[in-house]
Amino acid sequence: MQNRSSSPDSSSAGNTHFGFQSVPEGDKANKVAEVFHSVAARYDVMNDLMSAGLHRVWKAFTIGRANVRPGMKVLDIAGGTGDLARAFAKRAGPSGEVWLTDINDSMLRVGRDRLTDGGLILPLAVCDAEKLPFPDQYFDRVSVAFGLRNMTHKDRALAEMRRVLKPGGKLLVLEFSRVAKPLAPAYDWYSFNVLPWLGKKVANDEASYRYLAESIRMHPDQDTLADMMRAVGLDRVQYFNLTAGVAALHEGVRLG
């Protein structure tokens, strides 16, 4: 199995991709929701399997690059189990405001419960990243970790993220990306053979894990995503390859 390339939102008229399948655009959100309802309770296990535990290191790098300071307003989109939101809240302090959002209520409940267990109560919202329910120029930081690749219209979501950023605010996108070519055969073998097998054994859910592997291959590569961020009006766009490109952190700043 070779890496497949994709256009920014590779789709034909009225269709988009769900993993390697072509589906009507209106169906993708429901199909993705089914996957994450299925994996919500074991989401951290899923990320450990997909990244060999390295997602924790990548998130720590993202938190450092975010440079959240006391009093800042931060939006964590597709926040899952709340890892980033928890770290941002500690840095923003009582004078700050950190929102945890996700389109999937099962994921958001897991995040809420884990934050509460850790003594944190944060504002939560079930919302679509393509239609954020926040005012213009409200947040100092916006983050999305391992969520952008599941969105139907990535360009619309990125435009919304820019809209809610204050001038000088930063967007951080952490996502599985295009691995360095020498590692691609081994990585593909792991993704399409080992990962679904582990999903079946650990979570009794081979299909969801196969979709997640396919969704990584269909996600835009590093340079394409950087161009998409520039196209919606973000400046100072750059990215950092993590673990030879298994993941990448993209950054962009709203200047005006």
Swiss-Prot record:
It comes from the Bacteria. Pfam families: Ubie_methyltran (PF01209). Pathway: Quinol/quinone metabolism; menaquinone biosynthesis; menaquinol from 1,4-dihydroxy-2-naphthoate: step 2/2; Cofactor biosynthesis; ubiquinone biosynthesis. Its EC number is 2.1.1.163, 2.1.1.201. InterPro entries: SAM-dependent_MTases_sf, UbiE/COQ5_MeTrFase, UbiE/COQ5_MeTrFase_CS. It catalyses: a 2-demethylmenaquinol + S-adenosyl-L-methionine = a menaquinol + S-adenosyl-L-homocysteine + H(+); a 2-methoxy-6-(all-trans-polyprenyl)benzene-1,4-diol + S-adenosyl-L-methionine = a 5-methoxy-2-methyl-3-(all-trans-polyprenyl)benzene-1,4-diol + S-adenosyl-L-homocysteine + H(+). Residues 1-19 have a biased composition (Polar residues). Residues 1-24 are annotated as: Disordered. One of its GO terms (molecular function) is demethylmenaquinone methyltransferase activity. PANTHER family: 2-METHOXY-6-POLYPRENYL-1,4-BENZOQUINOL METHYLASE, MITOCHONDRIAL (PTHR43591:SF24), METHYLTRANSFERASE (PTHR43591). Methyltransferase required for the conversion of demethylmenaquinol (DMKH2) to menaquinol (MKH2) and the conversion of 2-polyprenyl-6-methoxy-1,4-benzoquinol (DDMQH2) to 2-polyprenyl-3-methyl-6-methoxy-1,4-benzoquinol (DMQH2). Belongs to the class I-like SAM-binding methyltransferase superfamily. MenG/UbiE family. This is Ubiquinone/menaquinone biosynthesis C-methyltransferase UbiE. It comes from Bordetella avium (strain 197N). The gene is ubiE.
